[in-house]
Swiss-Prot record:
The gene is UGDH. SUPFAM superfamilies: 6-phosphogluconate dehydrogenase C-terminal domain-like (SSF48179), NAD(P)-binding Rossmann-fold domains (SSF51735), UDP-glucose/GDP-mannose dehydrogenase C-terminal domain (SSF52413). Homohexamer. GO terms for molecular function: identical protein binding; NAD binding; UDP-glucose 6-dehydrogenase activity. Residues 321-325 are annotated as: Important for formation of active hexamer structure. The active site is at residues 161, 220, 276. Its EC number is 1.1.1.22. GO terms for cellular component: nucleoplasm; nucleus. It comes from the Eukaryota. NAD(+) binds at residues 11-16, 36, 41, 89-93, 130-132, 165, 276-279, 346. The modification N6-acetyllysine is found at residue 107. This is UDP-glucose 6-dehydrogenase.
Length: 494
C-alpha cells in the first residue's frame, strides 16, 4: 500500500489550518505543510497570534509547529514534495454571470488543479477538502488528463470536512465519521486506502466511510442542507409561538425528546450564518434547477427564504418596539461573529440586522470579544450593506459591552457569547435611556428574564412573549431583502 509521508494543504483558512494542524498533531511521522498565497495570513500562522480563533487550536499548533507542521507561501515546492495534496480553498457563491447568487464559483479550485499538475511528477493523491458541487472531482480530473505528462499519476479523492466552527478541534479529534470518496478502480481504491491509513492514526476504522466521489460530494452538501433546514424549521415555529403565546424552547424540548427527531439544531434564533449553510443550500438549489428538478429546488430554496424572513422579522420587531423609529437612536449590538467561540463573521446575522437598522438611521455601537474592528468595518462596508459614508457616520466599534450600552435605547444580542450572561445588567440599565429594551436574538438570557424585568428592562426574545406591554410591529415584508452575494466587495475605509 502507498504510504503518505508528506502532505501539502493549499489554503490556510478555517478548514485547512485546523484540519492539517490536527493531522500533524496526531501523525508526528508525517510532515505537513500548509501553504497560501496570502503572506500576512501565513505570517500569522507562524506567530503567537493565529489568524483565526478556535478553542484549543493554539495549543495544537504550538505542539507541532516547526517540528512536522509548517506554514509557507512557497506553494510550488510544497506541491512537488508532497505525496498528498489537500485542496482547501474558498468556493464562494458566484456574484456574476450564469448561476449568480446560487452556483459555486470554482475558479480557485481550477487554479489549484492547474498548479498541481504543473508542479507534480510520479504518483500523487489530490484530495478535495473544500465544499464543492457534485462532479467537481471530475472537473479536476479532466484538467489533469488534459495536461498529463510521462510518469505522472494523479489520483483524485473527495474528503469533505464536517467540523463546526467553535468546536473544530474537538470535532477533528473525535469525528462522528470521516468520509472519503474515490474512483471505483484499483488505482482509485489504492488512493482511498492510503488516506484511510492517515486517519486510522486516531479514528476507529468503523468510523471511516468510503464511497464514490459523487456520493462524497453530495453527502457534504446534503448534510449542511439538513442542518440548515432544522434551524429554519424551528425558526418558523418561533413565529407561530410569538403569535399564540407558546414558548419555542418548550416546544423544541418536547419534540426533541422524540428519538426519531432528536434535540440537535432545534435552537430558535435570529437566523443561521457562517460560510457553509447558505452557500451550500443555494448550491443544492442551483444543482436541482440544472438537473430539471424544479420542485426539489423550490423545497430547498424555502430554507433560505425562512432564514431571510427571520432576520427581517427580528429587525422589524426592534424598530416597531422602539416606537416605530430608530433614527438617530443609539443601539448596542452585542456580538458580531456568526456564532460563539469563533471570530468568523461570514453571513453573520449581525451584518443583516446592522444593515436594516442603518437603513433606518440608527447609530450602532458594536462589540464582539473576538472580531477585530477592521473585520466589522469590512463587512458593513460591503456595497450590498451600506452606502457611501454610512459606516463612518453610523457605526462605532466599542472596546467593551458596557461602553456599547452606555446611553443606548436598546441592546440587541446577535451572538450567543457566554459572557453576555454574566454582564452587570443593573449597571447597564442605569446608563441606558428609558424605557430600556433588550432584544435577545439568541435566547442567551432565558434564565434572567424575571430578574431583568425587575431591574426595569423590557425584554423581547425569539419565540416567546415576555414583556406584557408589547407594541404590535409591522409586517416584516416592509423590510426589503438583500444578499451579500449581490455585488462584489468594495475597498472599505478602515
Amino acid at each position: 500500500m502507498f504510504e503518505i509521508k508528506k502532505i501539502c494543504c493549499i489554503g490556510a483558512g478555517y478548514v485547512g489550518g485546523p484540519t492539517c494542524s490536527v493531522i500533524a498533531h496526531m501523525c508526528p511521522e508525517i510532515r505537513v505543510t500548509v501553504v497560501d498565497i496570502n503572506e500576512s495570513r501565513i505570517n500569522a500562522w507562524n506567530s503567537p497570534t493565529l489568524p483565526i480563533y478556535e478553542p484549543g487550536l493554539k495549543e495544537v499548533v504550538e505542539s507541532c509547529r516547526g517540528k512536522n507542521l509548517f506554514f509557507s507561501t512557497n506553494i510550488d515546492d510544497a506541491i512537488k514534495e508532497a505525496d498528498l495534496v489537500f485542496i482547501s480553498v474558498n468556493t464562494p457563491t458566484k456574484t456574476y454571470g450564469m448561476g449568480k447568487g446560487r452556483a459555486a464559483d470554482l475558479k480557485y479550485i481550477e487554479a489549484c488543479a492547474r498548479r498541481i499538475v504543473q508542479n507534480s511528477h510520479g504518483y500523487k493523491i489530490v484530495t478535495e477538502k473544500s465544499t464543492v458541487p457534485v462532479r467537481a472531482a471530475e472537473s479536476i480530473r479532466r484538467i489533469f488528463d488534459a495536461n498529463t505528462k510521462p510518469n505522472l499519476n494523479l489520483q483524485v479523492l473527495s474528503n469533505p470536512e464536517f467540523l463546526a466552527e467553535g468546536t473544530a478541534i474537538k470535532d477533528l479529534k473525535n469525528p462522528d465519521r470521516v468520509l472519503i470518496g474515490g474512483d471505483e478502480t484499483p488505482e482509485g481504491q489504492r488512493a482511498v486506502q492510503a488516506l484511510c491509513a492517515v486517519y486510522e492514526h486516531w479514528v476507529p476504522r468503523e468510523k471511516i466511510l468510503t464511497t464514490n466521489t459523487w456520493s462524497s460530494e453530495l453527502s457534504k452538501l446534503t448534510a449542511n442542507a439538513f442542518l440548515a433546514q432544522r434551524i429554519s424549521s424551528i425558526n418558523s415555529i418561533s413565529a407561530l409561538c410569538e403569535a399564540t403565546g407558546a414558548d419555542v424552547e418548550e416546544v423544541a424540548t418536547a419534540i426533541g425528546m422524540d428519538q426519531r427527531i432528536g434535540n440537535k439544531f432545534l435552537k430558535a434564533s435570529v437566523g443561521f450564518g457562517g460560510s457553509c449553510f447558505q452557500k451550500d443550500v443555494l448550491n443544492l438549489v442551483y444543482l436541482c434547477e440544472a438537473l430539471n428538478l424544479p420542485e426539489v429546488a423550490r423545497y430547498w430554496q424555502q430554507v433560505i427564504d425562512m432564514n431571510d424572513y427571520q432576520r427581517r422579522r427580528f429587525a422589524s420587531r426592534i424598530i416597531d418596539s422602539l416606537f416605530n423609529t430608530v433614527t438617530d437612536k443609539k443601539i448596542a449590538i452585542l456580538g458580531f461573529a456568526f456564532k460563539k467561540d469563533t471570530g468568523d463573521t461570514r453571513e453573520s446575522s449581525s451584518i443583516y440586522i446592522s444593515k436594516y437598522l442603518m437603513d433606518e438611521g440608527a447609530h450602532l455601537h458594536i462589540y464582539d470579544p473576538k472580531v477585530p474592528r477592521e473585520q466589522i468595518v469590512v463587512d458593513l462596508s460591503h456595497p450590498g450593506v451600506s452606502k457611501d459614508d454610512q459606516v463612518a457616520r453610523l457605526v462605532t466599534i466599542s472596546k467593551d459591552p458596557y461602553e456599547a450600552c452606555d446611553g443606548a435605547h436598546a441592546v440587541v444580542i446577535c451572538t450567543e457569547w457566554d459572557m453576555f450572561k454574566e454582564l452587570d445588567y443593573e449597571r447597564i440599565h442605569k446608563k441606558m435611556l428609558k424605557p430600556a429594551f433588550i432584544f435577545d436574538g439568541r435566547r442567551v438570557l432565558d434564565g434572567l428574564h424575571n430578574e431583568l424585568q425587575t431591574i426595569g428592562f423590557q425584554i423581547e426574545t425569539i419565540g416567546k412573549k415576555v414583556s406584557s406591554k408589547r407594541i404590535p410591529y409591522a409586517p416584516s415584508g416592509e423590510i426589503p431583502k438583500f444578499s451579500l452575494q449581490d455585488m462584489p466587495n468594495k475597498k472599505p475605509r478602515v
